[in-house]
């Protein structure tokens, strides 16, 4: 368990660092209020987690240390949206359509509502991204 936590932590560090770096680079070349950095990072994260799980599953290494490092660690540090996307796809592929709809709806609506609640709980005067 400790080894797994360290592996996830290492992957998360590099994923988070890359997220910050890419976000800054994208921010420097885009204008306006649209959150391009977040969208690009989230979409890249979805591609990365799909590639990683596809690769490791094809080789029968879905539970390997490398899989843990790159998926839960790196992709998790890069973006949790990639995990949400992968889990949603799993629900679709296994025919759990009601669970899929519920999961997506609750995640999106609940996420927005809880973000708003967080701003309100902190007494934030506006809903601005730092």
Regions found by a protein language model. Name each.
Residues 1-130:
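Membrane-interface helix-loop junctions in multi-pass transporters/channels
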